Amino acid sequence: MELENIVANTVLLKAREGGGGKRKGKSKKWKEILKFPHISQCEDLRRTIDRDYYSLCDKQPIGRLLFRQFCETRPGLECYIQFLDLVAEYEITPDENLGAKGKEIMTKYLTPKSPVFIAQVGQDLVSQTEKKLLQSPCKELFSACAQSVHDYLKGDPFHEYLDSMYFDRFLQWKWLERQPVTKNTFRQYRVLGKGGFGEVCACQVRATGKMYACKRLEKKRIKKRKGESMALNEKQILEKVNSQFVVNLAYAYETKDALCLVLTIMNGGDLKFHIYNMGNPGFEEERALFYAAEILCGLEDLHRENTVYRDLKPENILLDDYGHIRISDLGLAVKIPEGDLIRGRVGTVGYMAPEVLNNQRYGLSPDYWGLGCLIYEMIEGQSPFRGRKEKVKREEVDRRVLETEEVYSSKFSEEAKSICNMLLTKDSKQRLGCQEEGAAEVKRHPFFRNMNFKRLEAGMLDPPFVPDPRAVYCKDVLDIEQFSTVKGVNLDHTDDDFYSKFSTGSVPIPWQNEMIETECFKELNVFGPNGTLSPDLNRSQPPEPPKKGLFHRLFRRQHQSNSKSSPTPKTSCNHRINSNHINSNSTGSS
């Protein structure tokens, strides 16, 4: 039994390390899998793609890189890209250096005498920006200037880009992105845990070598529990939220027996494990603060989509290889209709907000209560309304949430005590974060006084703890309880509409990020010499014929050999014998 677990872990660790070869986990045929189509095959895509500047040139990672390459080949446009880069750099500059960095931008790009002066930013706006820089520089100082540059770029430069070989190449990448996804797209590894409808296992994309977690939802189990809307809801929310602090959905596909969500893999274990199984319960405040800041950023990204998470607890916060966290398991998350409130008594005992327990209507407020519970538990080493391993009825825990105040030990600084107290306010209208400003109000609390959120969001701050890369932070394979067989449920054609809505293939932004991170983009995104067209982009050059299979090559070679033979009856007989022999062998090996 122990041997089986060791083997499963060893295979997984080798895959995580890239297999130990030069291809870093990529298939031998990865270039064939990601071979660009001839541009003539992309005409339908060209006609139907949404020609929105922000979508094509800013939001989509490969689109952004290709538009950048286009601008760098136009001397008059290169300075605009450099300006936007410097503004992005300014926004993550430490506060004490903002003044100097701001002056650098003003001098280089917003001074008329400069050789790279950007005239598209109006003089009135330049004057206002300069005045603010002298008074009190802030992170958003150049936002309006950057918007002016985007307003210019989305005009003539964008339309020129749409007629360039760089946009043609983008269409080729989109064609690859939209290819069917099946179980053969991946290699499967050990089971990592269980979800509500099936197992979660590690997997690896054959073409790129990138590791993911595959959440299998068994079709019969979904149907038996009438979980179709819940499963589709989670998939659609994951698809829309693009956040480095929430697990990303990269692929959604189906097999004969299951629906599969391919998600960011988090190899560092969950917060519950780290709070209770790594020395004394709880964290030092500095570590708790870092995780709280990243959780807050994840909530902010969800709330931006008007989505309330409703299940904040340590088990649902996962660590990656580097020690950064992501919110996982969006099964209870729900999108709130614009201008409306919802009702629903869902969540985990001890973490549900008073308004949820009382079945009142609510918006985003339960998530700020959940954040308060998490900060408290990370510092204290137990949840605010239930002792560690305390045996107590659900009704008693609910009563404590509604009627009692949490107790603070000497582990809490004044700032930590204050933020927990304000987040755990029982009246949601008075709770921190539940006013118009939302997460921005929480970020301004003194607890986060020394946290640079711009640098955090840019991934520039080092986590306080890095997981051991040689460890597998999950239960032994045989300790993960297996699901029983679902009986008495039959799948039929009436389920197909649901499956088609679920199985939509690759998700654009995560897929494009995968191509960039695994260096597939760098290696494949090659044009002709001196900025000329590559053969696959040349409309006057016909596409290469598809490669013939082994059987075709063998048969053709035999046919050519026989054509050279003398047409005597004896040779003709030998021809028939040889031809049959070749066919027999070919069929046997196919």
Curated annotation (Swiss-Prot):
Enzyme Commission number(s) of this protein: 2.7.11.16
Record PTM text: Autophosphorylated. Autophosphorylation may play a critical role in the regulation of GRK5 kinase activity.
Lineage: Eukaryota, Metazoa, Chordata, Craniata, Vertebrata
Enzyme class: transferase
Residue list for modification Phosphothreonine: 485
Organism superkingdom: Eukaryota
Residues where ATP binds: 192-200, 215
Region listing for Disordered, in residue ranges: 557-590
GO terms for biological process, alphabetical: apoptotic process; fat cell differentiation; negative regulation of apoptotic process; positive regulation of cell population proliferation; protein autophosphorylation; regulation of cell cycle; tachykinin receptor signaling pathway; Wnt signaling pathway
Annotated AGC-kinase C-terminal domain residues: 449-514
Localization per record: Cytoplasm; Nucleus; Cell membrane
Subunit structure of this chain's protein: Interacts with ST13 (via the C-terminus 303-319 AA). Interacts with TP53/p53. Interacts with HTR4 (via C-terminus 330-346 AA); this interaction is promoted by 5-HT (serotonin). Interacts with HDAC5. Interacts with GIT1.
Gene source species: Mus musculus (Mouse)
Keywords: Apoptosis, ATP-binding, Cell membrane, Cytoplasm, Kinase, Lipid-binding, Membrane, Nucleotide-binding, Nucleus, Phosphoprotein, Serine/threonine-protein kinase, Transferase, Wnt signaling pathway
Protein name: G protein-coupled receptor kinase 5
Phosphoserine modifications at: 136, 484, 579
Family assignment from sequence similarity: Belongs to the protein kinase superfamily. AGC Ser/Thr protein kinase family. GPRK subfamily.
CDD domains the UniProt entry points to: STKc_GRK5 (cd05632)
Pfam family, one: RGS
Protein kinase domain: residues covered: 186-448
